[in-house]
A protein has these predicted regions:
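ATP-dependent adenylation/nucleotidyltransferase module used to activate substrates
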Residues: 1-183
């Protein structure tokens, strides 16, 4: 709850995959009002008749705005400043692009921060501490971007910070080991 008496509000980047869906659930469990943003790219793998992001938004009863990534996105993937990840995906450049757009939307809806389903250590190119810091800085979201962190990192951080929230929220999720997250 904010000093004004209203609930804290956050904008979540929701792909509809497990990690972003869990991130939404975690925010809602903490009493944070959530609105979601989903980027539709030419490479979107949504099933006919349904999209994972739309299904998750409906399940959690949260507003979802679908945004076409557009031609700017295509320019970025043709010549990414930070290079390609596995399978030719320009991970870092895509995250910066999407988060810059998300920042504008967050301002419109008066969200205090933005969160993603990024999990520290899950992807070697874009989901390590250095890359997440770069993405946060280049997107202009210093201290306004929250991501998910694995158990061992959380435990070390809690010891260091005595369990308090600082610039980010640190949750216990295990990254690529999705079976553990589902139990």
């Amino acid at each position: 709850m904010l000093e004004t008496g209203r609930k804290m509000k956050a904008l979540g980047l929701l792909s509809g995959g497990l990690d972003s869906t869990l991130a939404v659930k975690l925010m809602l469990e903490r009493g944070i009002e959530v609105e979601a943003l989903n980027f539709v790219t030419p490479f979107c793998l949504c099933r006919k008749g349904g999209c994972g992001a739309a299904e998750a938004a409906k399940t959690f009863n949260i507003p979802l705005k679908m945004v076409s990534a557009g031609t700017d996105y295509l320019r970025i993937i043709r010549k990414p400043k930070y290079g390609y990840g596995k399978n030719m995906n320009p991970c870092v450049d895509c995250r910066i692009f999407m988060l810059k757009k998300a920042k504008k939307h967050a301002q419109l809806i008066k969200a205090e921060f933005i969160f993603t389903g990024e999990v520290l250590g899950q992807r070697p190119m874009s989901q390590h501490r250095g890359a997440l810091d770069l993405i946060e800085r280049k997107a202009g979201l210093k201290e306004r971007l929250f991501a998910l962190y694995p158990v061992d990192f959380c435990q070390k951080l809690r010891q260091k910070r005595k369990g308090s929230w600082t610039n980010r929220s640190y949750w216990t999720l295990l990254g690529a080991r999705e079976k553990d997250n589902l139990s």
